[in-house]
Design a protein with these regions (language model features):
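Alpha-helical transmembrane segments of integral membrane proteins
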Residues: 3, 7, 11, 87, ...
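Membrane-proximal soluble regions of multi-pass membrane proteins
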Residues: 28-81, 85, 150-155
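Hydrophobic transmembrane alpha-helices
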Residues: 95-142
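Long, highly hydrophobic alpha-helical transmembrane signal-anchor segments
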Residues: 1-41, 95-113
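Weak global preference for isoleucine
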Residues: 2, 11-17, 21, 41, ...
Length: 155
């Protein structure tokens, strides 16, 4: 069982690197713009029900907050900076989505091998380390979009 956890954790970190490599390669393709406006869960109530607020708190109060310093805001942010911040958030979101897909391949392999518990552990790690961060980025992008909409109405 320990082997399942260590392997899953290792593959999750490797998947982050794969995501960081794949995203810039695909950013030059036409369909990338469609990917940058994905929104899987638009309802804030559902986000709360699946524990996204708790996940956000855990990220903000753990060592994970240091993983992408470009996504931390220490001061009041200007409108132009907010748009750059949103673009960086989109990149981070897509990194995690591609990492989720990469790790999904390993999960499918384990299922075909009949290692169902191993696949379940990997799926849990994949959800926590790739899907939830992506959902959190989408949630934060929607918040930024609402704020930008208000700023555009005022000007």
């Amino acid at each position: 069982m320990i082997k399942y956890f260590t392997f899953s954790f290792s593959i999750a970190f490797i998947s982050w690197i794969v995501g960081m490599i794949v995203t810039p390669l695909l950013s030059k393709m036409d369909f990338f713009k469609g990917l940058s406006s994905l929104s899987f869960i638009k309802n804030d109530r559902i986000n709360t029900l699946i524990g996204l607020q708790l996940f956000k708190w855990l990220i903000m109060h753990s060592f994970f907050k240091y993983f992408n310093p470009k996504l931390s805001v220490k001061k009041r942010i200007l409108k132009t900076e907010l748009e750059e911040y949103r673009a960086e958030m989109t990149t981070a979101e897509l990194n995690h989505l591609f990492a989720f897909a990469f790790m999904g391949v390993f999960i499918i392999i384990k299922l075909f091998q009949g290692l169902y518990l191993f696949a379940a552990v990997m799926l849990l790690f994949n959800i926590l380390m790739n899907l939830y961060p992506s959902l959190l980025q989408q949630h934060n992008k929607r918040r930024i979009d609402r704020y930008l909409h208000i700023l555009n109405q005022r000007s």
